[in-house]
């Protein structure tokens, strides 16, 4: 980084001299601006190159800066400055490590009791080593399909809370379902239940101050995650908390794809029916979900809640058929945890890989793994939305379809409504449900959390849900897909060029 600073100083000095000379001889403000902008672009290009980013990211940034200097310069100020990311999150990482050493089991001994094939066990070792959370055999899970089932279950469990409620969400809206949640939380707070609520400051930027203040007045602790006050001077806008977590009394937890908003109940006229998946967890694994929340709470408030009140011995339930493991991923971690576990799941497959992702923007590793699996004769299926909510991501996703189709991947476009489910099922034996999409933002930038399931009954429910979803989807034909208009191909190509930045 010192070399980068020296280069930066040199570029600025040279740029200033050129700018002054240009301004003196031509006397044109435009010339001064042009030279300064050129120097700024050169400086950013040097910084990006010296950071040793992934080649695709480096090339994408250089292409944007070269083609659209002013737009690229502003875009970089907003989204590209990752060089001090590790320093920002060092305090959180140190605290997280201390918490894990103190409160997690030293080794996943119980895993040996799982009825897993030898080729699947490396996945468990990887998950424990880079995810640092153990597999629980004393937990029960229930798949919640879509909004009505999810919110019914959430409100039923919230009503039972006696000691504490912890919530962490990316999007919270003050619409009908948001108001219902507010009323329940206010009532529980008045009953003496401690309610803590982390909401992402960017994802929930439309949330009204009145909504927040009403909750605070009732005793709910409302904390925004990484508020952004000066967007162009801080790239905090780029690292968002995409997690959806609820923990009730330390024994019941929820995680999955649904935020708090009426659209998740199918009340948005554009999207209509909203297809999503959430997971209810009871028992030992909830302790991991609690730890993830407490680590994020400490990061934003400095408050340590590592007491028996919140981390008492977990609620013991009857040992289930399989294992449950909660894994957190984020820019504060050394490893690309979610991506590496997705990769390991894909490469462990012997029969089938079924993926549902609303935003499919894979990096080269995941893309290659899917193609190799399909070429090897494995039943690889991708379920994606037919109706976009983010057009640039939609077009970027479709740019990957031709090579996947050529490799033998079956691609289904969901037609009943909008697909927002983030699920992977491998061989009908392993699965992941959570907040992470199969895209670069979830892999590298966002704070995410997924539940990895091993030989649980819930996996059978996920398989049934997939089969039902395929009934409401159309399978893309390669020859027909190649007939799409030239303007669409251009949109896909440009979007794909930007995909490392998305």
Swiss-Prot record:
UniProt catalytic activity: 2 a 1,2-diacyl-sn-glycero-3-phospho-(1'-sn-glycerol) = a cardiolipin + glycerol
Gene Ontology MF terms in the entry: cardiolipin synthase activity
Active-site residues per Swiss-Prot or TrEMBL entry: 242, 244, 249, 420, 422, 427
SUPFAM superfamilies, per database record: Phospholipase D/nuclease
SMART domains for this protein: PLDc
Gene3D superfamilies linked: Endonuclease Chain A
Residues that span the membrane, as ranges: 7-27, 29-49, 59-79
Membrane topology type: Multi-pass membrane protein
EC number: 2.7.8.-
Family to which the UniProt record says this protein belongs: Belongs to the phospholipase D family. Cardiolipin synthase subfamily.
Name the record gives this protein: Cardiolipin synthase
Species for this entry: Geobacillus kaustophilus (strain HTA426)
Phylogenetic lineage: Bacteria, Bacillati, Bacillota, Bacilli, Bacillales
């Amino acid at each position: 980084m010192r070399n980068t600073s020296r280069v930066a100083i040199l570029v600025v000095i040279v740029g200033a001299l050129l700018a002054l000379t240009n301004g003196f001889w031509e006397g044109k403000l435009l010339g001064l601006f042009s030279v300064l902008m050129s120097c700024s672009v050169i400086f950013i290009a040097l910084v990006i190159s010296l950071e040793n980013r992934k080649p695709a990211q480096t090339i994408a940034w250089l292409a944007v800066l070269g083609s659209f200097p002013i737009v690229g310069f502003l875009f970089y100020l907003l989204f590209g400055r990752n060089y001090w990311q590790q320093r920002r999150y060092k305090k959180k990482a140190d605290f997280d490590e201390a918490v894990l050493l103190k409160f997690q089991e030293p080794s996943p001994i119980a895993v040996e009791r799982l009825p897993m094939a030898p080729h699947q066990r490396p996945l468990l070792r990887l998950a424990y080593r880079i995810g640092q959370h153990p597999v629980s055999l004393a937990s029960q899970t229930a798949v919640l399909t879509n909004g009505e089932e999810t919110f019914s279950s959430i409100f039923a469990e919230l009503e039972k809370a006696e000691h504490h409620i912890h919530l962490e969400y990316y999007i919270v809206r003050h619409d009908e379902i948001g108001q219902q949640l507010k009323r329940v939380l206010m009532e529980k707070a008045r009953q003496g239940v401690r309610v803590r609520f982390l909401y992402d400051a960017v994802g929930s930027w439309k949330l009204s101050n009145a909504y927040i203040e009403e909750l605070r007045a009732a005793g709910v602790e409302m904390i925004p995650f990484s508020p952004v006050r000066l967007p162009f001077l801080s790239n905090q806008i780029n690292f968002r908390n995409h997690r959806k977590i609820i923990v009730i009394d330390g024994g019941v937890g929820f995680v999955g794809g649904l935020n708090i908003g009426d659209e998740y109940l199918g009340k948005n006229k554009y999207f209509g029916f909203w297809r999503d998946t959430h997971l209810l967890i009871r028992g030992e694994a909830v302790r991991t979900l609690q730890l993830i929340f407490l680590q994020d709470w400490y990061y934003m408030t400095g408050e340590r809640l590592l007491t028996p009140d919140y981390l008492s011995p977990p609620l013991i339930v009857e040992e289930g058929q399989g294992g449950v493991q909660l894994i957190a991923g984020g820019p504060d971690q050394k490893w690309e945890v979610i991506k590496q576990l997705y990769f390991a799941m894909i490469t462990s497959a012997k029969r089938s890989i079924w993926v549902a992702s609303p935003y499919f923007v894979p990096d080269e590793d995941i893309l290659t793994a899917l193609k190799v699996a399909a070429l090897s004769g494995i039943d690889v299926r991708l379920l994606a939305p037919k109706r976009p909510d983010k057009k640039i991501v939609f077009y970027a996703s479709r740019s990957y379809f031709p090579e996947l189709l050529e490799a033998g991947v079956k691609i289904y476009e969901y037609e009943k409504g909008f697909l927002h489910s983030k699920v992977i099922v491998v061989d009908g034996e392993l699965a992941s449900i959570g907040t992470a999409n199969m895209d670069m933002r979830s892999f590298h930038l966002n704070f995410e959390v997924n539940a990895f399931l091993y030989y649980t009954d819930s996996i059978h429910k996920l398989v049934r849900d997939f089969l039902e979803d395929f009934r409401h989807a159309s399978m893309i034909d390669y020859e027909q897909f190649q007939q799409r208009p030239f303007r669409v191909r251009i949109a896909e190509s440009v979007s794909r060029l930007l995909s490392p930045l998305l």
